[in-house]
């Protein structure tokens, strides 16, 4: 999603080791530069490794973890610090998982698509166990911070979701939240976020202070003892005091903003300011219904609010009761804060009229490499 052109490749953006697919998912291709290697599949995919394609053997998630573990081991053996960012293609459609994982769920009565969806998740769980086992084996836990998180709320493929058949005893589950991926409601943006650092933070705690991805960098900086960050470039705040136990809560005065931010090339972003957005603080979620926008039946099923709404997330985490008429002043403050945010963000929305790339870089590089020697087999590291 960050761009498939060469300047945007991870090995050109500060990463020493990059083992990636292209586009937004394995095998994807769109009418722009966003495209993976031609004909790629979840099993035995062609992967771009530090700027060159290699042919792998195995399931994509297993391969990503194996590659990362091999690199981590090399850093451990060299007594060097490391930062590993492992982003899996799964769980993402098409929903295909290793046979043993799929069978577990078909045996429980799930349809093939659902079984693939849940099988992908189980496979990630297995690989997380493999990662944690190796960190323990290599005695790295005392010096390593481990974070597990997702990038958006509940997605497709689950039991009972948008017409998917319901396996007996396994109805649709979204932790009671309203909305799915693509929605500005809680269920569209709330994700799991777990942290571990042995010997430094007390384990087994649930911290209920609302935080966001923008808080991760300030927290890392605080851990490293960096007190001053570039002004006007780094948003967010450190939640290190919560991790250390120095504080039980942080100020609840700030707002977090969400916008779906999807419009066609050449469209005026200001026309979408009041569509598919939300404002959140510790207690309330204000959800914009989308002025002058029709909400489709599919969007309603996804939890998209047809009108502006305010919810007390402490008393009503499932967003069942719109209290905007009882607290119009709260809604107005949140709407005003969002308006201020948009005015600050709009000048940063550059290249809105830039034409789509006429080429697909991964396709071009793949053809060039096939012409000049072919695609070698990837040699998996010994762990």
Model-predicted regions and their roles:
Residues 1-8, 21-25, 84-96, 148-156, ...:
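Short, solvent-exposed turn/loop segments enriched in Gly/Ser/Thr/Pro and often Arg
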Residues 2-82, 88-106, 115-118, 272, ...:
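Formylglycine-dependent
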Residues 5-14, 94-97, 110, 133-200, ...:
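Histidine-centered active-site microenvironments of extracellular/periplasmic hydrolases
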Residues 14-16, 77-84, 140-146, 189-191, ...:
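Loop/turn elements at helix/coil->beta-strand transitions in domains of secreted/extracellular proteins
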Residues 17, 21-29, 156-184, 201-205, ...:
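C-terminal cap/loop subdomain of S1 sulfatases and analogous C-terminal strand-loop tails that border
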Residues 48-53, 109-114, 148, 174-178, ...:
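Flexible glycine/proline-enriched surface loops and loop-helix/loop-strand junctions
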Residues 65-73, 103-144, 169, 223:
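A long, amphipathic alpha-helix that forms part
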Residues 216, 302-309, 313-383:
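Long, internal low-complexity/basic segments
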């Amino acid at each position: 999603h960050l761009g498939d052109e060469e300047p945007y490749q991870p090995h050109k953006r500060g990463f020493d080791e990059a083992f990636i697919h292209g586009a937004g998912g394995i095998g994807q291709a769109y009418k722009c530069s966003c495209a993976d290697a031609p004909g790629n599949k979840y099993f035995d995919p062609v992967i771009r490794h530090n700027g060159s394609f290699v042919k792998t053997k195995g399931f994509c998630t297993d391969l990503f973890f194996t590659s990362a573990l091999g690199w981590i081991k090399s850093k451990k053996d060299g007594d060097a610090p490391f930062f590993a960012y492992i982003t899996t293609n799964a769980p993402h459609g098409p929903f295909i998982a290793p046979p043993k994982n799929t069978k577990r769920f078909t045996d429980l009565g799930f349809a093939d698509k659902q079984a693939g969806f849940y099988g992908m998740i189980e496979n990630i769980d297995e690989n997380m166990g493999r990662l944690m086992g190796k960190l323990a084996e290599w005695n790295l836990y005392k010096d390593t911070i481990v974070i597990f998180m997702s990038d958006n709320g509940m997605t497709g493929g689950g039991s009972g979701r948008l017409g998917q058949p319901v396996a007996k005893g396994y109805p649709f589950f979204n932790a009671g939240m309203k909305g799915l991926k693509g929605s500005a409601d809680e269920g569209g943006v709330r994700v799991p976020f777990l942290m571990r650092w042995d010997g430094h933070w007390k384990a087994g705690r649930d911290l209920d202070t609302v935080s966001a991805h923008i808080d991760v960098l300030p927290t890392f900086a605080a851990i490293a003892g960096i007190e001053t960050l570039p002004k006007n470039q780094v948003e967010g705040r450190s939640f290190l005091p919560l991790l250390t136990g120095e504080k039980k809560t942080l100020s609840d005065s700030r707002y977090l903003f969400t916008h779906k931010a999807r419009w066609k090339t050449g469209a005026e972003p200001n026309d979408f300011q009041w569509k598919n957005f939300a404002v959140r603080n510790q207690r309330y979620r204000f959800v914009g219904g989308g002025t002058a926008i029709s909400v489709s039946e599919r969007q309603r099923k996804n939890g998209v609010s047809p009108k502006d709404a305010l919810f007390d997330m402490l008393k009503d985490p499932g967003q069942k009761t719109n209290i905007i008429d009882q607290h119009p002043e709260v809604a107005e403050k949140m709407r005003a804060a969002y308006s201020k945010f948009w005015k600050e963000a709009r000048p940063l929305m550059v290249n809105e009229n830039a034409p789509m790339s006429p080429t697909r870089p991964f396709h071009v590089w793949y053809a060039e490499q096939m012409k000049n020697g072919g695609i070698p087999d990837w040699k998996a590291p010994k762990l």
